[in-house]
A protein has these predicted regions:
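Extended, low-polarity transmembrane helix blocks
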Residues: 1-35, 57-65, 69-155
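Membrane-interface interhelical connector segments
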Residues: 34-55, 59
Length: 155
């Protein structure tokens, strides 16, 4: 079982997918976890998720860890499948809870609702993150990953 967790191929495409998904999620995770990049930090993020969004504390904690630690796992290629799973689940929940009702498109044009409020973001970006996460869960971290190094030592 442990060998399967670390097993991956010497694939540059997987490395690129892993690295770029990690780069995209690193600032989001650090906003929630440490308050970097203008974020609210752990306490503020927990308060927002549990208070305003009504998410149970354990799931709020897991969401913050999935983005914060998951992005680090993707950047280093350590426990890539676990990191990708956390981020994929986060994105599925985000689509369901926040973005689905806004439609497909991201609204980068600043469209407004009929009530004069900014229209929310759609879910097209999230689908890409979900697809990349699923690919990484299936194939692993690829070339230049710590998983590959560990897998080689487990043989």
């Amino acid at each position: 079982m442990i060998k399967k967790l670390f097993k991956t191929e010497n694939d540059t495409a997987l490395f690129i997918l892993r690295l770029l998904l990690g780069i995209v999620f690193f600032p989001h995770g650090m906003q929630k976890l440490l308050g970097w990049f203008g974020g609210y930090g752990f306490a503020g993020s927990m308060g927002f998720f549990t208070g305003q969004m009504g998410i149970p504390a354990i799931f709020a904690f897991l969401a913050i860890m999935a983005e914060g630690l998951g992005s680090l796992g993707l950047l280093t290629g350590l426990l890539t499948r676990v990191a990708a799973f956390g981020i994929t689940v986060n994105m599925i929940v985000a689509v369901y809870m926040v973005h689905w009702h806004n439609g497909f498109f991201m609204n980068w044009s600043g469209a407004m609702t009929s009530a004069g409020k900014p229209a929310g973001e759609g879910f097209e970006y999230h689908l890409l993150a979900i697809a990349i996460g699923i690919a990484l869960m299936i194939k692993g971290g690829g070339r230049w990953s710590l998983d590959r190094v560990i897998s080689g030592k487990l043989k």
